[in-house]
Swiss-Prot record:
GO molecular function: agmatine deiminase activity; protein-arginine deiminase activity
Active-site annotation: C359
Gene3D superfamilies, A to Z: L-arginine/glycine Amidinotransferase, Chain A
UniProt record similarity statement: Belongs to the agmatine deiminase family.
Phylogenetic classification of the source organism: Bacteria, Pseudomonadati, Pseudomonadota, Gammaproteobacteria, Enterobacterales
Designated name of the protein: Putative agmatine deiminase
Length: 368
């Protein structure tokens, strides 16, 4: 089947009446990618693969899960993945569907299209996490083909984890990532903001200066802060003034407290406590092969965050990261989402690879 993106729309989603819905809008499916890079996932990827299977199993309670799997690993995936997960042959360079997959936009008639952003492995030659991302660049088009959705080729390097929207005109992001010179150095802040308006149909952008400390994505918003519902956000928080995260969280809180969303509302801010601090062990670091990917070092601070959860069809799938704080996070999430199923999945193996549950998933909002 010829790619719908072979001749992408020359207009923009906003011109055509399309907008990115909030994550709590209904989903037809959630996509994931099989983790296989032995220079990123320890012990030949086996612990991560088992963890991805548990995440898929949790999501599949309410939402169909589709997983892209390189052909050479299909037999392995069939042994590990739950039978109700649809496995689709798809090449990739790593397993971060949030960042390489398409951003789906809908119009008032319920039609579905997708945005294929440019991708450079979180920084290209200036801090990118691996050297060759040519397969990753093809992922979004393949997902759109699967759903027979037409697409827009956006003239912007952007990962899905760097944006959150409330579905009512407001976008959250971080300057640390979106204005990083290793992403779109030729574009000004004003030009990037205009592209956000053109492609996502938002009107108000709330800029946090930084994301989570030592986040190798250059501070993705989806690890730091997200919308709970219109007018409410969850923020990664620590009360420890000696922690390098403290100043980042306080600065974000001040911005959010002063902000007004696209509808003129003040924001209610939920503080989600940081786990840990968490660090990679010697055993964990030694289990990763040397290769093209960024080196995994024993003792390195892990950017663990409970904000890195997925909202899908009245369910929250969140990472279990620290026995001391997991229950606190669960209770807070249940308060934030009183009518939702709250599903925790042990997720340290994902964190060791550089992200978490939101980073490895990408929702396909329901078309009417």
């Amino acid at each position: 089947m010829m790619s719908q993106l072979a001749a992408p729309h020359v207009t923009t989603p906003h011109q055509d009446g399309f907008a990115m819905p909030a994550e709590w809008a209904p989903h037809d499916a959630v996509w994931m990618i099989w983790p296989y890079r032995t220079d990123n996932w320890r012990e030949q990827g086996v612990p991560a693969q088992k963890t991805f299977a548990r995440v898929a199993e949790a999501i599949a309670q309410n939402t169909p899960v589709i997983m892209g799997v390189p052909a050479r690993y299909m037999a392995d995936a069939q042994k590990v993945m739950p039978v109700n997960v649809t496995l689709v042959e798809m090449e990739s360079d790593d397993a971060w569907m949030r960042d390489t997959g398409p951003t789906i936009v809908l119009n008032q008639a319920g039609e579905r299209r997708g945005i294929d952003w440019q991708f450079n492995a979180w920084g290209g030659e200036l801090g990118g996490l691996y050297e060759d991302w040519r397969q990753d660049e093809k992922v979004a088009a393949q997902v759109l083909d699967y759903h027979q959705a037409a697409g827009y080729a956006a003239p912007l390097i952007l990962e899905g984890g760097s944006i959150h929207v409330d579905g009512e005109g407001t976008l959250l992001t971080t300057a640390e990532c979106l204005l990083n010179p290793n992403r779109n150095p030729h574009l000004s802040k004003a030009e990037i903001e205009q592209l956000m308006r053109d492609y996502l149909s938002i009107s108000t952008i709330i800029w946090l200066e930084e994301g989570v400390y030592n986040d190798e994505t250059d501070g993705h918003i989806d690890n730091m802060c997200c919308f709970v519902r219109p007018g409410e956000v969850a923020l990664h928080w620590t009360d420890d003034e000696n922690d390098p995260q403290y100043a980042r969280s306080v600065a974000a809180y001040e911005v959010l407290s002063a902000a007004r969303d696209a509808q003129g509302r003040e924001l209610k801010i939920w503080k989600l406590p940081a786990p840990g601090p968490l660090h990679a062990t010697k055993e964990e670091a030694q289990g990763v092969d040397s290769g093209d990917a960024v080196e995994r070092l024993a003792g390195s601070r892990l950017a663990g965050s409970y904000v890195n959860f997925l909202i899908s069809n009245q369910q929250i799938i969140f990472p279990l990261l620290d026995e001391k704080t997991d229950d606190v996070a669960r209770d807070l999430l249940q308060q934030m989402f009183p009518d939702y199923l709250i599903s925790g999945v042990p997720a340290r193996e994902i964190l060791l690879g550089g992200g978490n549950i939101h980073c490895i998933t990408q929702q396909i909002p329901t078309a009417k």
